[in-house]
Amino acid sequence: MTKADTIFKENITKIMEEGVWSEQARPKYKDGTTANSKYITGSFAEYDLSKGEFPITTLRPIAIKSAIKEVFWIYQDQTNSLDVLEDKYNVHYWNDWEVEGVPANNGDKRSIGQRYGAVVKKHDIINRLLAQLEANPWNRRNVISLWDYEAFEETAGLQPCAFQTMFDVRRVGEDVYLDATLTQRSNDMLVAHHINAMQYVALQMMIAKHFGWKIGKFFYFINNLHIYDNQFEQAEELLKRQPSDCQPRLVLNVPDETNFFDIKPEDFELVDYDPVKPQLKFDLAI
């Protein structure tokens, strides 16, 4: 059993046994009913990527390719355009969060409001981060924040769930490692937990490659970790499943010091991944 599988089962059990019920919940199911959930607060996990510990479960298949494409949409394309996400990456699940009548920051008609990539572009976040790490890798101010009150007031739109990432550099002997800490305000445990974690591991790997560093540790903090009330059967099924014997790893197949903006989604490869099947179905809360 991988570390991710152990943490996954522990979190599911804790939510089901100790979680409290949401109140005045915002999300809705497609039929318009309120999407209530059981949740815990203050969830934390640590993975040492350099030792092959990756935050992806083997208890069900995870759509890692489309998840990584979303990282490129946000941090390379730096746009909120649904047209770019669909036409360039063939990713469609963000359509449910379209904000009607709000054009994208690149002029396209369809957008998710002034969120995610639009905020990255507005503040030139990636270029500033890379320049800061270039000037002094050991500085303690390497922060990506997507929490922009001005943007929230400007347009409607889903406020970012994974909203802050911090980076630190460590030298161990002759090797330099890049660590990352992801802070998330809210996480759908069964659907999005490993997707979000692996997305930001991919971002960490892209930045490390840019400088020729090794990937180090990945820390994951979630303020509100929940399971929706239409997912309890799937939760019980996941607890019954026996994980596969594989130890999946994400690999970035580009040379060291490849420019961040030259890396492509197809450069990533998930190896030794043989998840338990069949896939489970989930009705999303929007």
Curated annotation (Swiss-Prot):
It comes from the Bacteria. It is found in: Cytoplasm. It holds the Pfam family Thymidylat_synt. (6R)-5,10-methylene-5,6,7,8-tetrahydrofolate binds at residues 188, 285. SUPFAM superfamilies: Thymidylate synthase/dCMP hydroxymethylase. Catalyzes the reductive methylation of 2'-deoxyuridine-5'-monophosphate (dUMP) to 2'-deoxythymidine-5'-monophosphate (dTMP) while utilizing 5,10-methylenetetrahydrofolate (mTHF) as the methyl donor and reductant in the reaction, yielding dihydrofolate (DHF) as a by-product. This enzymatic reaction provides an intracellular de novo source of dTMP, an essential precursor for DNA biosynthesis. Belongs to the thymidylate synthase family. Bacterial-type ThyA subfamily. Keywords: Cytoplasm, Methyltransferase, Nucleotide biosynthesis, Transferase. GO terms for molecular function: thymidylate synthase activity. This is Thymidylate synthase. Signal peptide: none annotated. Its EC number is 2.1.1.45. Pathway: Pyrimidine metabolism; dTTP biosynthesis. GO terms for biological process: dTMP biosynthetic process; dTTP biosynthetic process; methylation. It is an enzyme of class 2 (transferase). One of its GO terms (cellular component) is cytosol. DUMP binds at residues 140-141, 185-188, 196, 226-228. Homodimer. InterPro entries: Thymidate_synth/dCMP_Mease (IPR045097), Thymidate_synth/dCMP_Mease_dom (IPR023451), Thymidate_synth/dCMP_Mease_sf (IPR036926), Thymidylate_synthase (IPR000398), Thymidylate_synthase_AS (IPR020940). It comes from Streptococcus thermophilus (strain CNRZ 1066). The active site is at residue 161. It catalyses: dUMP + (6R)-5,10-methylene-5,6,7,8-tetrahydrofolate = 7,8-dihydrofolate + dTMP.
